[in-house]
């Protein structure tokens, strides 16, 4: 569930409360499910210059994420699934777009900076106790285009890339360990359906292109406007 409020003509604030369902089946007798809220986020979006149709339209954004979902570092990993990241984080980014009627091209970049997750006491295999996690930073980039099939229907496609630095794990009565760096790529295919001059239903299917990306993701959004 997302809420967006226009503070000024070129400045808006938003919050997002995700509801997450996850399922994992390792064997016919070992199935795990989780249904809970995810990590709540608060953000802002600023457009310094009004679009004139000739030059690039630039927007800048930032957000703060609260670890309200089930932390992967506080659950029993053998019996439960997480619905959140487990740590506070902040991000900043930009987006650029331009209309080349009937094609609309866009791109974006971002940096993600998470804070450490400490005061942990999670038992891992071989009776190791996890006490702290220093997550890696992530850089993201996406490029795409949209095409208007008619006044009411459009389709879009984009490719998203991300690069994450190493995680560092701290163990009770042991030296720390690190995970490897990772890269991820996702192909997104979506559509927009205009149901009124101010309202468009959006759908998107994400297909993972690398082992570190989810196999498939699906999103569906319907905006609702409220005037205060």
Task: Give residue ranges: language-model regions.
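Residues that define the transmembrane beta-barrel architecture of outer-membrane proteins
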Residues: 1, 34-40, 56, 84-90, ...
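Residues on the lipid-exposed face of transmembrane beta-strands in outer-membrane beta-barrel proteins
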Residues: 1-5, 15, 42-46, 62, ...
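Outer-membrane beta-barrel channels and translocator barrels
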Residues: 8-10, 20, 49-53, 100-103, ...
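Transmembrane beta-strands of outer-membrane beta-barrel proteins
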Residues: 13-15, 42, 56-62, 90, ...
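Transmembrane beta-strands of outer-membrane beta-barrel pores
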Residues: 17-23, 48, 64-70, 98-102, ...
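Outer-membrane beta-barrel translocator domains and adjoining extracellular loop/strand segments
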Residues: 24-31, 70-78, 112, 117-126, ...
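Detector for outer-membrane/organellar transmembrane beta-barrel domains
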Residues: 79-171
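Outer membrane beta-barrel transmembrane domains
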Residues: 128-228
